[in-house]
């Protein structure tokens, strides 16, 4: 779409905002159109979500709900992005690679579970970790060696970098990618629970990307100046549109789950955006709900192994609230509210520097 401007005297299609808008609506329409067809196909093939044997009783009724919906909304976002991005932008190409590779890892994991009808099948934790490390290196190393990406570490509410991580930045970035990917995966346990916070996180990071990629805005707001970063906003917009199309069918009661193909890809992509926009530390606030879910699992496992006692009735923490009697819809909406507030606070850091 960018190259259509070469065929006319107008620069309309060169604007990032215009192409982001087109990408959003293309992905939204694709997702809304393809998702019901996928649901019908998945039901016919019995490609449903295996339910964990210790899950709350209310989850037993979801055993026939189709999974792997992430494959559709990720594909919709990628197709829409390919129509709208500039192909000579290394940030945009690396971002698409991240989305595709982490989706493939999740898809392999999903297929193992669906084919064997066992929630413990799929990729082993060790194989999944290895695959995530390899995918992360494929996405990060080209940026590192091209010197397009700064290795300096920034913290929220402070305009200067703390220090230069140099070669150690690679290990830190891989940690961010893997942590973010698995955190969203842990959160995806209730209908729409991971979807809406992901939309909030993508929106917040998209704003940071746009501002940092614009030399005038970044200078005025004292943000890191990274030329070419704005192009990734188009992919953000496409993914938000695709997620909104998915949410139409994923909201309570869900007609389809995203599966690992969706959650691992979303988390990996959110982590990647935090890295290239230099918001690795602020990601703790941007993805606060994901952090909360992950910390609850770490506390539960650690406490049980060390003290033989559980901190929560069940982890991740959304299952704890189910066990104490909260209805599913109430948990979902309250977590959405927390995600919205944490992202608004993250955006406030733009001016508080």
Swiss-Prot record:
It is found in: Cell inner membrane. The keyword Membrane applies. Its main location: membrane. GO terms for biological process: cell division; cell wall organization; peptidoglycan biosynthetic process; regulation of cell shape. The chain crosses the membrane at residues 22-42, 65-85, 88-108, 129-149, 161-181, 192-212, 228-248, 256-276, 281-301, 330-350. It catalyses: UDP-N-acetyl-alpha-D-muramoyl-L-alanyl-gamma-D-glutamyl-meso-2,6-diaminopimeloyl-D-alanyl-D-alanine + di-trans,octa-cis-undecaprenyl phosphate = di-trans,octa-cis-undecaprenyl diphospho-N-acetyl-alpha-D-muramoyl-L-alanyl-D-glutamyl-meso-2,6-diaminopimeloyl-D-alanyl-D-alanine + UMP. It is a multi-pass membrane protein. One of its GO terms (cellular component) is plasma membrane. One of its GO terms (molecular function) is phospho-N-acetylmuramoyl-pentapeptide-transferase activity. It is an enzyme of class 2 (transferase). This is Phospho-N-acetylmuramoyl-pentapeptide-transferase. It comes from Campylobacter jejuni (strain RM1221). The gene is mraY.
């Amino acid at each position: 779409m960018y190259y259509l401007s070469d065929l006319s005297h107008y620069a309309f299609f060169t604007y990032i905002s215009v192409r982001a808008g087109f990408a959003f609506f293309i992905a939204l329409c694709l997702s809304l159109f393809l998702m019901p067809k996928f649901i019908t196909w998945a039901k016919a093939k019995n490609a449903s979500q295996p339910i964990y044997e210790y899950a709350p009783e209310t989850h037993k009724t979801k055993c026939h709900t189709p999974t792997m919906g992430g494959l559709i909304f990720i594909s919709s976002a990628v197709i829409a992005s390919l129509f709208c991005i500039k192909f000579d932008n290394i940030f945009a190409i690396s971002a698409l690679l991240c989305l595709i590779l982490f989706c493939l890892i999740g898809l392999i994991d999903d297929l193992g579970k669906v084919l064997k009808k066992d929630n413990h099948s799929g990729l082993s934790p060790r194989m999944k970790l290895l695959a995530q490390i390899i995918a992360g290196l494929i996405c990060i190393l080209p940026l590192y060696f091209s010197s397009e990406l700064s290795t300096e570490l920034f913290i929220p509410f402070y305009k200067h970098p703390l220090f230069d991580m140099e070669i150690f930045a690679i290990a830190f970035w891989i940690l961010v990618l893997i942590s973010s990917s698995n955190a969203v995966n842990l959160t995806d346990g209730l209908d729409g629970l991971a979807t809406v916070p992901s939309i909030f996180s993508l929106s917040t990071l998209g704003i940071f990307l746009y501002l940092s990629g614009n030399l005038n805005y970044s200078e005025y707001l004292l943000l890191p100046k990274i030329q070419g970063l704005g192009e990734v906003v188009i992919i953000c917009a496409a993914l938000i549109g695709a997620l909104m199309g998915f949410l139409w069918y994923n909201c309570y009661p869900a007609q389809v789950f995203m599966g690992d193909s969706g959650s691992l890809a979303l988390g990996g992509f959110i982590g990647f955006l935090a890295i290239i926009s230099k918001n690795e530390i602020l990601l703790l606030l941007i993805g606060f709900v994901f952090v909360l879910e992950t910390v609850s699992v770490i506390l539960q496992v650690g406490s049980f192994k060390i003290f033989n006692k559980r901190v929560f009735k069940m982890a991740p923490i959304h299952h704890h609230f189910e066990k104490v009697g909260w209805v599913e819809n109430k948990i979902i909406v309250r977590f959405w509210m927390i995600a919205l507030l944490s992202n608004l606070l993250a955006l406030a850091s733009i001016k508080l520097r």
